[in-house]
Amino acid sequence: MTVPPVPAATQPRSILVTGAGHGIGRAIARLFLSRGWRVGMYDVDAAAVAAEAGGQPLAEHGTLDVRDAEQWARVLEAFCGERGLDVLINNAGVLSSGRFVDIDLPAHHRQVEINLLGMVNGCHASFPYLARAHGQVVNLCSASALYGQPGLATYGATKAAVKSLTEALDLEWREAGVGVRSLIPLFVATDMANAARNAASVRRLGVHLTADDVAAAAWRTVHGRQVPLRSPHRSVGGQTRVMAVACSVSPDWLTRLMVRQTAL
């Protein structure tokens, strides 16, 4: 379907946020809404996003299970219509922590299906709308993508895949004028971090970021200058920046030692 773009001056910029009912997604939706954006708030928890939208004229909401490609198509058509999409925030995610063999197989599969395949579904379905607006994708990644974390094995694997997906699509979609970025926080004070509170790395490194910190990073990322050869990844918080630099310059044996000391 080829539809001419609507001039930007006639409408507010648009952002669609997955997992917008709670935590980081909710904080991002609130921030962009407070600054005059048209915000699509979607979550498997329909009641949460309905309450959050609260009848605000620039807030739209609905149910979205990111694992369902057909649901993605319906949501995008309903929210975007003949308009493009300025920003997609791929935030929906789940986490199961513990020793790998102690976590049941359905929980491992659920993390892969939501954290990775849900993001693949969203990127694939939203591309025509993003291309129309020369928009951006912001993928929620994690510091667990920097090196495999014992106790968070499958979760970290999904986030490492998200990191790779971000890099590939940012290069592949550049000719269409679509930027792809990732946000890489360490542990954030949300229900998800609470679920991982028994992981050794959470206990030793602590939880020093809030959902609002990540939302502010999302705002800066969306409004940052696009530099062709700059990394698409944005570390959130001082701890994460130090970890990212350390992982990039340290020999593998030293990185393994550091991870072992914090995660075991």
Which sequence ranges carry the predicted segments?
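Conserved glycine-rich Rossmann-like NAD(P)H-binding loop of the short-chain dehydrogenase/reductase
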Residues: R35-A50
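Residue(s) in the substrate-gating loop at a strand-loop-helix junction
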Residues: S142
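Substrate-binding pocket helix/loop in short-chain dehydrogenase/reductase
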Residues: R99-H109
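Conserved NAD(P)H cofactor-binding loop of Rossmann-fold oxidoreductase domains
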Residues: N91-S96
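C-terminal helical subdomain
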Residues: S182, R203-R241
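Active-site helix of classical SDR
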Residues: C123, T158
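Conserved glycine-rich cofactor-binding loop
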Residues: G21-H22
